[in-house]
Amino acid sequence: MTGFFTILSFSLAALSVTNAAQILSVPKGAEVVPNGYIVVMKDDTSQQDFSSHRVWISSIHHNMTRRGLDGAGVKQTYDFDHLRGYSGIFDEDTIKDISNDPKVAFVEPDAIISQHVVVQQRKAPWGLSRLSNRRGGRNYVFDSSAGSGVWAYVVDSGVDVRHAEFQGRAVWGSNLVDNKNSDGTGHGTHVAGTIAGKTYGIAKKAKVVAVKVLNSEGKGPTSGIIAGINWSIRHARKHGMLQKSVLNMSLGGTYSAGLNHATAQAIKAGMFVSVSAGNDNINSNGNSPASERSVCTIAASTENDGKASFSNWGPAVDLYAPGHNILSARPGGGSQTMSGTSMAAPHAAGVAAYLIAKEGIPGNRACLRLKQLSQPTIRNPGPDTTTRLLYNGSGR
């Protein structure tokens, strides 16, 4: 994980005038989009008021351009069931005007998010057998339903949807970060392979939907992550799949109220959401989306049921899952081994998809079910952190 995500402390300092919406700050040293901001409206803002606000924003776009702020204006609009907002490029004067609108809840800088992978090396896989046996074992034990009828939204760096691991079950969904419909880092393909690959996957019959929010450097703006969540909810709703969907985000950055709020909307809509805890060996309460308490936040375990040395910890962690030396798919064919909480989170997404198909539970109740089935086997988990290890309930 790159340096600008290692900072734990954060401030919610109000920079705006009295009675105006807060303009939240980011930790010192955090990487941000220049002049980029995320604006979140108050919960009771009607669709009509939101439309009027956007018309007003459009009217000042010309003024921003005249002041020399190239590319200014609204870039993305968010319209969740219980969250309305937008992101874009705005100068300081415009942000002050926006924050003074009584319909605005808060404004925050658009920080950069990155994937949670730390190392790549060759070694045999072990995660599948571990999550299907209470005391460990060499075989992966699972029900033949294997995630059939469940969709897995991989909000990541893209997925090689033509990889043989997916047997035609992977499709391209949306690209919200660049114009390259490919996986430039291999991260998203590896994650998807753990969720639903025929060899390396847990839910071997689930459908994969690629939602690209990270570029070829494994980075993307918070605004794009929010847009990816919004797109996934809309897509699942359109196809009647909200309660039969899992959404995995093996990524994170500094605390973002907007990202946490958006992530919670997916659970409220009916989906299961797994996120990686982070790779800085610190309390994950300072990171987003890991600090959002309604999601399933996953820390990384080792082959010997210990906490991986890099894994974040803390009360926000719901479960541990295999995250060290995990073998999965690689873009262009073949496989590769990666380590990180990025590798742990898709194990949880895969088991959630498996249980949704096997037991018929709705997606937004799957995290509770995972915790019910989990085993208290993790040694030295970290301060105020669960000892529960992911288990699919099918082994011995």
From Swiss-Prot:
Residues 21-116 form a propeptide. Residues 37-113 form the Inhibitor I9 domain. One of its GO terms (cellular component) is extracellular region. Keywords: Glycoprotein, Hydrolase, Protease, Secreted, Serine protease, Signal, Virulence, Zymogen. Pfam families: Inhibitor_I9 (PF05922), Peptidase_S8 (PF00082). Residues 125-396 form the Peptidase S8 domain. Residues 377-389 have a biased composition (Polar residues). Its EC number is 3.4.21.-. GO terms for molecular function: serine-type endopeptidase activity. The active site is at 156 (charge relay system), 187 (charge relay system), 342 (charge relay system). PANTHER family: ALKALINE PROTEASE 1-RELATED, PEPTIDASE S8. Belongs to the peptidase S8 family. This is Subtilisin-like protease 5. It comes from Arthroderma benhamiae.
